[in-house]
C-alpha cells in the first residue's frame, strides 16, 4: 500500500466522476494502492482488494514515524477497545499509529507481540515495542522512547489515557517481550 486516505471519509466511485455510483468509502488513514491516475482521480485498490476511483486530493503519501503518529493521541482518555481521540487503549494506540502510516497490523497486544520480531534489550531503539502481561499472553503494550521512557495508553491510579512517562516500576516486572514491527 503506497498512499493513505487523508480525509475523514472519501467516496470510492465506480468511474472517475462525482456522479458515478458510490461503491464504498475510505476512512481517514486507510491504506490503498494507486493503480492509475486520470484527470485528478486515482484508480485505487484497498487493502481488502476492493477497486474504485477516488479524488487524488483525498489521498496522501505514506510517510512518517509511528511515535509521532501515536503522539497525536497524547491526552486522549483510556478506553478499552477504543481507537479514537475520544478514547483509546494500549493496543489500539499501536494499531492506529501504524495504520496512519499505511501498515495494517493486528489489533490486540498479544497478536501484535506475535507479529513482531524479538529484540534484545541491548538492541532496543526508539519505536520498538514492549509487551507486558502475566501467564501466557500479553495484556499491555507500549512504545519504547529511549532513556527509560515509554509512550502508551494506560488506566491506573492517578493516570488515565495516553502518556509519555518513565516506565512505571510496577510494569517493569511484567515485561514479556521486546519486539520490532
Predicted segments, located by residue:
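Aromatic- and glycine-rich peptidoglycan recognition patches
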Residues: 1-4, 68, 83, 145-181
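Active-site nucleophilic cysteine motif
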Residues: 70, 84-101
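...with weaker cross-activation on analogous glycine-rich loops/strands in unrelated enzymes
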Residues: 103-165
